[in-house]
UniProtKB/Swiss-Prot annotation:
Naturally occurring in which organism (per UniProt): Thermobifida fusca (strain YX)
EC number: 2.7.4.3
Entry binding sites for AMP: T31, R36, D57, L58, V59, G85, F86, P87, R88, Q92, R133, R144
Family of this protein: Belongs to the adenylate kinase family.
PROSITE patterns: ADENYLATE_KINASE
Full protein name: Adenylate kinase
Gene name of this polypeptide: adk
BP GO terms, sorted: AMP salvage
């Protein structure tokens, strides 16, 4: 099964990605993991990405896209994968379509973890308190939500129009959210 997981910061994407990938016996593919693997492996793409990160700049889409393309072509991703953190915008979604077409496969489903804004703020504020992260104040969190809405709303609409979107209520105990996601995935299998 080929799955994309989207949702606002604090929706539980990392947690659900780990659990769902394990339950489905497919690799969790996250851009963070891919960046770390390429940088620590000293790949050509890793060196290019590192130069941007060292300057505090965002890694351009073409480098991110190339890293994702390479990762999805690996043997363990042939039977399926769960993408976490990619695509983040419409351009990346269109590139993902091209990548998958080149590999001769299609996306099965896009899971959107749905959490209202106040719950996101509560979760991230709590996470900041526990992790002692002073940068995650309410103003910063609200800004991250604005950026998410601007970039990801068109992405959600793009997948909804294609009949790939499953909205998952991501409020409640982790196990319940996982169960809702698994039910949605089984309906697509």
């Amino acid at each position: 099964m080929r799955v994309v997981l989207v949702g606002p910061p604090g929706a539980g994407k990392g947690t659900q990605a780990q659990i769902l990938a394990s339950k489905l016996s497919i690799p969790k593919v996250s851009t963070g993991d891919i960046f770390r693997a390429n940088v620590s492996g000293g790949t050509e793409l890793g060196k290019k990405a590192q130069a941007y990160m060292d300057r505090g700049d965002l890694v351009p889409d073409e480098i991110t896209n190339a890293m994702v393309r390479d990762r999805l072509a690996e043997d363990d991703a042939r039977a399926g994968f769960l993408l976490d953190g990619f695509p983040r915008n419409l351009a990346q979604a269109e590139t993902l379509d091209e990548m998958l077409a080149d590999l001769g496969v299609k996306l099965d489903v896009v899971l959107e973890l749905v959490v209202d804004e106040e719950e996101v703020i509560r979760r991230l504020a709590e996470r900041a308190r526990i992790d002692n992260r002073s940068d995650d104040n309410e103003e910063t969190i609200r800004h991250r939500l604005v950026v998410y809405r601007e970039q990801t709303a068109p992405l959600v609409s793009f997948y909804e129009k294609r009949g790939l979107l499953e909205k998952i209520d991501a409020v409640g105990p982790i196990e319940e959210v996982t169960q809702r996601a698994m039910t949605a995935l089984k309906s697509r299998a």
